[in-house]
From Swiss-Prot:
HAMAP family: Ribosomal_uS13 (MF_01315). Keywords: Ribonucleoprotein, Ribosomal protein, RNA-binding, rRNA-binding, tRNA-binding. Transmembrane segments: none annotated. Part of the 30S ribosomal subunit. Forms a loose heterodimer with protein S19. Forms two bridges to the 50S subunit in the 70S ribosome. GO terms for biological process: translation. This is Small ribosomal subunit protein uS13. Belongs to the universal ribosomal protein uS13 family. Located at the top of the head of the 30S subunit, it contacts several helices of the 16S rRNA. In the 70S ribosome it contacts the 23S rRNA (bridge B1a) and protein L5 of the 50S subunit (bridge B1b), connecting the 2 subunits; these bridges are implicated in subunit movement. Contacts the tRNAs in the A and P-sites. It comes from the Bacteria. InterPro entries: Rbsml_uS13_C, Ribosomal_uS13, Ribosomal_uS13-like_H2TH, Ribosomal_uS13_bac-type, Ribosomal_uS13_CS. Residues 92-118 are annotated as: Disordered.
C-alpha cells in the first residue's frame, strides 16, 4: 500500500479510483492529477515506481485535503453560525440548509421521530 497524504492508498485499484480514497479528491481532481503527472489513469497503483508516487505526492500537496479541508469546512459552518445568518440558524437547529421541505421529509437531518406526549 502506498501512503500519500497520511492515507494508505489501495494498491489493487486503478490510479484514478485509488486517489479518490483521499478526502477532498474526487474523480475530476484525480483525473487532473494523473494528467499533470503524466501517469495513465488506468494504471494500477502497485505498478507505479517510487519516483512516480513521489510526483503524485508533490501534485497532491498543492491542494487542501484531509484534515485541513475538514477543519476549513467546520470553520465555515461555525462562521455562519456566529454571524447569525439564516444558514447558520439552520445548521444550529440541525435542519436542512438548502431549502428542502421539512414537513414530511428530512428525517436524516432531523433524526428519529419524537413521540407526542398527551
Amino acid at each position: 500500500m502506498a501512503r500519500i497524504a497520511g492515507i494508505n492508498i489501495p494498491d489493487h485499484k486503478h490510479t484514478v479510483i485509488a486517489l479518490t480514497s483521499i478526502y477532498g479528491i474526487g474523480i475530476k481532481r484525480s483525473q487532473y492529477i494523473c494528467n499533470a503527472t503524466g501517469i495513465p489513469q488506468n494504471t494500477k497503483l502497485s505498478t507505479l515506481s517510487e519516483t512516480q508516487i513521489d510526483t503524485l505526492r508533490d501534485v497532491i500537496t498543492q491542494f487542501t485535503i484531509e484534515g485541513d479541508l475538514r477543519r476549513e469546512v467546520t470553520l465555515n459552518i461555525k462562521r455562519l453560525i456566529d454571524l447569525g445568518t439564516y444558514r447558520g440558524l439552520r445548521h444550529r437547529r440541525s435542519l436542512p440548509v438548502r431549502g428542502q421541505r421539512t414537513k414530511t421529509n428530512a428525517r436524516t437531518r432531523k433524526g428519529p421521530r419524537k413521540p407526542i406526549k398527551k
